[in-house]
Design a protein with these regions (language model features):
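His/Glu-rich zincin catalytic helix
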Residues: 1-55, 160-266, 305-309, 390-401
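Charge-rich, well-structured scaffold segments of protease-associated domains
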Residues: 52-203, 239, 269-401
Length: 401
């Protein structure tokens, strides 16, 4: 059977149903296949046209979200309890019998190509693409960059084959959150638990890829008409299951993860090189990517990069003052509290823990890591994990002589 997880919380007569399919970019046989398979589910099924789906959901005050990640596809329905029989009927049809109609697919691909071309003229988009390709390489799903031609290679049969392989009852789980009634549980069990659906009942094989990092330290992508340059600095970092990860998160927040961070205080407030600079760890299935992000006037690119290294030096050599560390801790603990306030944000946390293969104690461990970390540990972690030599420098903008 399909695992069904229930989180009954909240006072409003609303529920959210998340159906997760194990099949994302990691599993696709060509670029964009996972994304468009998921995106096209609402564009017509055996029982409903795209217009009927949109109209009915609207009429019942329901909301459908489709998204896909490295290893999962998400189909999410928000519905009022009183209309759940009607909205679940549409939801079931979307999951079990999509048609991937050619006309609707053509329209969506055209609008995605337009968006891609608009993005391709933006320096931050170019810098980000260049960075992940430099860090992961062409053979890794993260480093494989979508090109305009890839959109033209998507057709209904490409999507149908991905759907047939991954969208089935042997490869999904359901999360039900909000004010959950016995009736809601019974309906979901009837629709999804009584008989298997889909064609292929194999679980996907767990795939792992080895990053092939470029040897270049600095990579420049030119946009001759750019008023500003985008700067991305990045390197491979810890994955979420690493024992040091939760404490490194505190270090990275202090470095560039909130408004009072070192990078903001120095490079924005003090030097005025940029309106905003940040650092964070982007999580992927088997690694993290530490990224420093900024946009700046072309003439400030070099001084900005120099100051980033200066802030790394300070973290590696000096102890963080107690009051500054207390401020970061308060910020992070407050942020965590806000993340677990509502039934739906709790469901998000819970899905995140399951899909990342983390222990159930993860939230408790995260709070503990923030509360207990010391200035000495911050300095040690900075020396171990903020490695200036491996940090790539990507600049996208106008060439300065």
């Amino acid at each position: 059977g399909i695992p069904l997880y229930i989180l009954n919380a909240g006072d409003n007569e609303v529920v959210r149903i998340d159906l997760l399919i194990e099949g994302g970019r990691w599993q696709q046989s060509q670029r964009l296949q996972a994304l468009f398979t998921n995106r096209m589910l609402r564009e017509g099924t055996r029982r409903y046209s795209a217009a009927a789906i949109a109209e009915k959901l609207d009429y019942y005050g329901a909301w459908l979200e489709l998204s896909s990640s490295s290893e999962y596809a998400y189909i999410t329905l928000y519905s009022l309890n009183k209309y759940l029989p009607e909205t679940l009927d549409i939801f079931e049809s979307i999951v079990k019998e999509p048609l991937f109609p050619e006309k609707e697919l053509g329209v969506i691909i055209d609008s995605n190509i337009q968006q891609f071309l608009v993005n391709s003229s933006k320096v931050d988009f170019l810098a980000h693409r260049t960075l992940i390709n430099a860090v992961y390489g062409d053979t890794h799903p993260c480093g494989q960059l979508v090109q305009k031609e890839d959109y033209h290679l998507i057709n209904p049969s490409v999507l149908q084959s991905f759907y047939d392989r991954y969208y089935h009852s042997g490869n999904c789980s359901i999360y039900l959150a909000g004010k959950v009634s016995e009736d809601a549980i019974r309906r979901i069990e009837t629709l999804f638990g009584s008989e298997p659906f889909g064609k292929d009942f194999r679980k996907p094989e767990k795939l792992s890829y080895v990053p092939v990092t470029s040897s270049e330290k600095r990579i420049f992508t030119e946009r001759a008409d750019a008023m500003q340059s985008a700067v991305r600095m990045g390197m491979l970092s810890l994955d979420r299951r690493h024992p040091d990860y939760l404490k490194v998160r505190v270090l990275v927040t202090l470095f560039g993860g909130y408004f009072g961070s070192r990078l903001m205080s120095n490079i924005r407030e003090d030097k005025g090189y940029t309106y905003g600079i940040s650092a964070g760890i982007m999580p992927y299935p088997d690694s993290g990517l530490l990224v420093v992000n900024a946009e700046t006037a072309n003439e400030f690119v070099e001084p900005l990069i120099k100051e980033v290294y200066h802030e790394i030096d300070r973290l590696q050599n000096d102890l963080v003052p107690a009051e500054e560390l207390a401020m970061v801790k308060n910020y992070m603990l407050g942020d965590m509290c806000r993340s677990y306030e509502s039934a739906f944000s709790l469901a998000d946390a819970w899905i995140f823990i399951h899909t990342s293969g983390l222990p159930d104690s993860y939230v408790r461990d995260a709070v503990e890591a923030v509360k207990t970390i010391t200035p000495v540990e911050i300095r040690e972690l900075a020396s171990r994990y903020l490695c200036k030599e491996t940090l790539k420098e990507i600049v996208s903008g106008k060439k300065m002589s």
